[in-house]
Amino acid sequence: MAGNSLVLPIVLWGRKAPTHCISSILLTDDGGTIVTGCHDGQICLWDVSVELEVNPRALLFGHTASITCLSKACASGDKRYTVSASANGEMCLWDVNDGRCIEFTKLACTHTGIQFYQFSVGNQQEGRLLCHGHYPEILVVDATSLEVLYSLVSKISPDWISSMSIIRSQRTQEDTVVALSVTGILKVWIVTSEMSGMQDTEPIFEEESKPIYCQNCQSISFCAFTQRSLLVVCSKYWRVFDAGDYSLLCSGPSENGQTWTGGDFVSADKVIIWTENGQSYIYKLPASCLPASDSFRSDVGKAVENLIPPVQHSLLDQKDKELVICPPVTRFFYGCKEYLHKLLIQGDSSGRLNIWNIADIAEKQEADEGLKMTTCISLQEAFDKLKPCPAGIIDQLSVIPNSNEPLKVTASVYIPAHGRLVCGREDGSIIIVPATQTAIVQLLQGEHMLRRGWPPHRTLRGHRNKVTCLLYPHQVSARYDQRYLISGGVDFSVIIWDIFSGEMKHIFCVHGGEITQLLVPPENCSARVQHCICSVASDHSVGLLSLREKKCIMLASRHLFPIQVIKWRPSDDYLVVGCTDGSVYVWQMDTGALDRCAMGITAVEILNACDEAVPAAVDSLSHPAVNLKQAMTRRSLAALKNMAHHKLQTLATNLLASEASDKGNLPKYSHNSLMVQAIKTNLTDPDIHVLFFDVEALIIQLLTEEASRPNTALISPENLQKASGSSDKGGSFLTGKRAAVLFQQVKETIKENIKEHLLDEEEDEEEARRQSREDSDPEYRASKSKPLTLLEYNLTMDTAKLFMSCLHAWGLNEVLDEVCLDRLGMLKPHCTVSFGLLSRGGHMSLMLPGYNQAAGKLLHAKAEVGRKLPAAEGVGKGTYTVSRAVTTQHLLSIISLANTLMSMTNATFIGDHMKKGPTRPPRPGTPDLSKARDSPPPSSNIVQGQIKQAAAPVVSARSDADHSGSDSASPALPTCFLVNEGWSQLAAMHCVMLPDLLGLERFRPPLLEMLARRWQDRCLEVREAAQALLLAELRRIEQAGRKETIDTWAPYLPQYMDHVISPGVTAEAMQTMAAAPDASGPEAKVQEEEHDLVDDDITAGCLSSVPQMKKISTSYEERRKQATAIVLLGVIGAEFGAEIEPPKLLTRPRSSSQIPEGFGLTSGGSNYSLARHTCKALTYLLLQPPSPKLPPHSTIRRTATDLIGRGFTVWEPYMDVSAVLMGLLELCADAEKQLANITMGLPLSPAADSARSARHALSLIATARPPAFITTIAKEVHRHTALAANTQSQQSIHTTTLARAKGEILRVIEILIEKMPTDVVDLLVEVMDIIMYCLEGSLVKKKGLQECFPAICRFYMVSYYERSHRIAVGARHGSVALYDIRTGKCQTIHGHKGPITAVSFAPDGRYLATYSNTDSHISFWQMNTSLLGSIGMLNSAPQLRCIKTYQVPPVQPASPGSHNALKLARLIWTSNRNVILMAHDGKEHRFMV
């Protein structure tokens, strides 16, 4: 699933909450969210209400090692950004509102603390992150792009910094950074706002360095109340210093030998200090520490022993302590302006949060009396509170008698080709089950709730205890037999299963420990190894097990330490094993001999060499960087487990290498609409299952099926339901005998076509034997029926049903809900569905069950509104009130899918397997074949061809069988219409009506920028949904909102230089301007990903040649913002910038309200530079020659094309119309060829898509401003003909854009004649010039004008005489143009004062009659018919003379305006010398020459 597609995760958590061993805590500034990081690398977001009730909302995945620190990263109120750092140097910037990852980076050092520092530059607020950790300096990082800007360095005894604090000075502009090094030396740096401009310059040295003899410093904090004191907490004592000269004011020892882990000021005279076992003490400071008291600093200079000791004020402790694995984490937070609580928050290893509200400590409280805890909640408690319990993927099949906990799923693998999920459980059994069916049971209400053991499934029993890993090798590589499934367990065994028959083929017992991993060797190994799989066990051994020979061909087992990574060197026949102690063993695969063992740098080099040999280090066990995205692209999802739980460091090169290689190997459109991925947060946890729905793939599959569907009259849902008989208890739903016959027929048909490719003979005989037994023995059938039979269900429709039912906002419109249930066959969810959100680089946030419990009571102004909502109403509406990003994704998905289903015939989910028999004709393929339509294996193009031919016979076989049992009825048309109407209502509700139905205080509107990035999505349905949503949202926010949007995004609009566009600039010059600095380091990574991101290359053209004052940020987000600004401003300008005037009514005054500020051409001195800049950006993107950064058919270029077309009237004053039209013609010159070979259902190729957009833009421009289009093209034609006459340029003339785009130009002219005839007549001579250029002369001579271009012959002022091949055209200014097709010459005659109404040649070609209604004259011209003239010798132009002129009474038009003026009168020759002037009202005037 490429990053570009729209992928939505839905999570099935199961009853056991994920392990969350808390390692760091943060409370957001508004006090509304607690963020906790854990040792496994996940981050949890907890909502906090005003009453301090806490509810876990989401879990964020993305880090691959323990989280070491969290910090806020944004100061503005609406954005709530948090930055996290992990032990292996990763840093992520998260949006706390919705869990999106905004930016991420990886540094070669570990941070242990981050402080956010904000300062203002001019009127702009800038944010910096000051990081310290396992390195001897403080790094200053930009808070938005995560780039390291500069560092604070020590001259004197540099060392690691153990903690740091920023002291804000109210009096001067200088802020100081105070830090303590590990050795107890206090360092002071001065940070001024001038340094904000600094970047990559020389480091800043400290101002002061002073030993204060504080060993093992845990924390240092500055007193915000007095602005004068510093608290330093060390493991055995804590001290207060004067921040002015760092002299000691007071010291406190540790209580009964405990270790302090941190502290902070609670008020001017109290501090709170906490210990590693979770107790916290509040102390009152002596007067000598308080700047306000008279005895301040009275103790300075005394020895530590003689200082006045602080008095213990109170103790905070938990009553009933649980056993914890590691010390809890405690932090103190006090509020900002609007948030007054002082909270002490503690998190421990069981995922529990304890909160004390310290604000209400009474002065008189006795020291021994502890403070009551305010709130206490753990993840597991939050799970347990929910009714119904959070569902696991196969809970209904895992019930244990006399226990309320289902069996835990310990390993899973999904087989997309069959839509089956294989789950290994803790009792050793393995279950194979249809994934969509089992998910429907868990998430939706329906008839399935009444059936036990639904859906039909198969159980494999063979392991004696927990199953630890599963592998379906065929999915990773097509060289493996598609029947084999491999499982490993804690019983040391590896078993080969046949998934079709359910039998155990072989057991390997070669290891002496539980199996931890099963891997597939790379493609280029030796033939023998290619049929092996590699197993890794906890006894530190690695085996190569041959599936073909059913024996272990090599066992490498002398490793002294656990195995961390496995690499391959196929060219040398080596298997390389890396262990946790850093040693590397190199084994020969064929002989099983140990070639060498290496340590240290040699070991690292050996591992790196393997990476070079196999560019994608896919199979490293510990590939932490194998993130979601990669794992999903590879469809080998073993990789994901490592991401979740092997906290091991590998080199970042792996990431880049495998990224690069992935792009090449992936077959196009091999995506599956559904992927199920099991993830664990910790090794000991049961699997959590995430269902990834790929909206684009689902749309493609639905459309492909629709295209291949046979005639509906043959099989209608009604027939199927009548025919299919009653269902029985077994897995097979058709009654025995007929099913067998039918099955046989279907099978024969398919076997003919696919035998060589997919079916195994032996399995067939087995099949027949079983079939006969099933018929005779119902018991046997029930126990042995195949898990999924061919006639049972349609995977694509089931996926769509599950997805649409989860996305729909239930309960807002009861009538529509009824339609959805009864007519469309959707099902209501049991409880709120936990969705997820995928963001950059495969980071994802998953909603925790019950995330909306506290949603109504969040701490915002909306708190009151929230209280009044009834409790039950959360179900269904939840997702549109969560966050703007979630709303955007969900609305895009539901609208694009509803539109797709609406375009299909009778696409209802009713009548599937739960009723009796499927709605759809069966798909070709036996139950055991990978259903070709879902995911053809990369190599199966031939197979696909065979299957397509197989489709028709299969269907007829099926329908005959059905008709034999029922009278055939034609499908009822009304139902089809009603179904489509239902989908249409569903789409309309979500597109337009949601804000009103939900109420604005709860509805989170879609994000304009996310929609803008999909303005030209490659999937047309998603594209249309995004455009409809964006325009609906822009209308909803009205003029004020649009103005605000413009103000927000205008600063990001890149300022392109004007001369870039002028046609005179050579391509080379442009290339040099576009050349970017060499990408190195992190930039290289960004480019590496570029293709795979949400908006593949929308950012490509944007920064190439922008002369900006400030350093161009290479940050992905920066470039993305520029692209987004171009699109958003382009859309607002195009759609709301100006009303396109109907032609001829130019005088109509424009009301000022229609034009957003900055987009009008008003004379009132208004600033319209915005429209100019937007227009420059759009034309730049259209005309910039293709380069690696801006490929010829990129999304951003296509978007520019589209917006230039839509808003042409707004941009026209600022653009070089000629260059733009030529650019568009260039893009669609080969449109016919491109658009001819597209496959129904599949997205267009980029080239075809560009052509389609350019075509559309040309039509829009032409109809919006016909005169501009016609005159510009005519000018180009004249220029071109002049060039052609010049013999030197002859060679290139046929390759020019104009010559290649002749067909397109004619197409547009035809549209204009159809829609805007008045404008065409105004410029008829120019139009004729263009037509004459575009039509082949020889063709016109052969077929005549009427046949070559019939549209132009509609006009009475055009006449063609075939024998002399002449065309006469009457112009607006009273002249007549005569074209001679043979010579290509044109001659003009003047004879009238007003526009010419009609012209006509006499039948023998001697005379030409011309009539003008305005000056009421009809003239007859004698054509020169001398021999020389008619043959056209000497290219002599025919001499014309006017022989007669008659006065005619003028004809009155029927009604003013409209096209009547064009049809006033026509000339009809009755013989060679007689002509009739026929007026539109039927009056005739006869004339004779």
UniProtKB/Swiss-Prot annotation:
<keyword id="KW-0853">WD repeat</keyword>
<feature type="repeat" description="WD 3">
    <location>
        <begin position="156"/>
        <end position="199"/>
    </location>
</feature>
<dbReference type="Pfam" id="PF00400">
    <property type="entry name" value="WD40"/>
</dbReference>
<dbReference type="InterPro" id="IPR049916">
    <property type="entry name" value="WDR7/72"/>
</dbReference>
<feature type="modified residue" description="Phosphoserine">
    <location>
        <position position="1455"/>
    </location>
</feature>
<dbReference type="GO" id="GO:0008021">
    <property type="term" value="C:synaptic vesicle"/>
</dbReference>
<feature type="repeat" description="WD 7">
    <location>
        <begin position="558"/>
        <end position="597"/>
    </location>
</feature>
<feature type="repeat" description="WD 2">
    <location>
        <begin position="62"/>
        <end position="104"/>
    </location>
</feature>
<dbReference type="Pfam" id="PF23123">
    <property type="entry name" value="WDR72_alpha-sol"/>
</dbReference>
<protein>
    <recommendedName>
        <fullName>WD repeat-containing protein 7</fullName>
    </recommendedName>
</protein>
<feature type="compositionally biased region" description="Basic and acidic residues">
    <location>
        <begin position="767"/>
        <end position="782"/>
    </location>
</feature>
<dbReference type="InterPro" id="IPR001680">
    <property type="entry name" value="WD40_rpt"/>
</dbReference>
<feature type="region of interest" description="Disordered">
    <location>
        <begin position="754"/>
        <end position="783"/>
    </location>
</feature>
<keyword id="KW-0677">Repeat</keyword>
<feature type="repeat" description="WD 5">
    <location>
        <begin position="404"/>
        <end position="443"/>
    </location>
</feature>
<dbReference type="GO" id="GO:0002244">
    <property type="term" value="P:hematopoietic progenitor cell differentiation"/>
</dbReference>
<dbReference type="InterPro" id="IPR015943">
    <property type="entry name" value="WD40/YVTN_repeat-like_dom_sf"/>
</dbReference>
<feature type="repeat" description="WD 6">
    <location>
        <begin position="462"/>
        <end position="507"/>
    </location>
</feature>
<dbReference type="InterPro" id="IPR019775">
    <property type="entry name" value="WD40_repeat_CS"/>
</dbReference>
<keyword id="KW-0597">Phosphoprotein</keyword>
<feature type="repeat" description="WD 8">
    <location>
        <begin position="1350"/>
        <end position="1389"/>
    </location>
</feature>
<feature type="repeat" description="WD 4">
    <location>
        <begin position="324"/>
        <end position="366"/>
    </location>
</feature>
<dbReference type="InterPro" id="IPR036322">
    <property type="entry name" value="WD40_repeat_dom_sf"/>
</dbReference>
<feature type="repeat" description="WD 9">
    <location>
        <begin position="1391"/>
        <end position="1431"/>
    </location>
</feature>
<feature type="region of interest" description="Disordered">
    <location>
        <begin position="911"/>
        <end position="947"/>
    </location>
</feature>
<feature type="repeat" description="WD 1">
    <location>
        <begin position="17"/>
        <end position="56"/>
    </location>
</feature>
<feature type="modified residue" description="Phosphoserine">
    <location>
        <position position="935"/>
    </location>
</feature>
<dbReference type="InterPro" id="IPR011047">
    <property type="entry name" value="Quinoprotein_ADH-like_sf"/>
</dbReference>
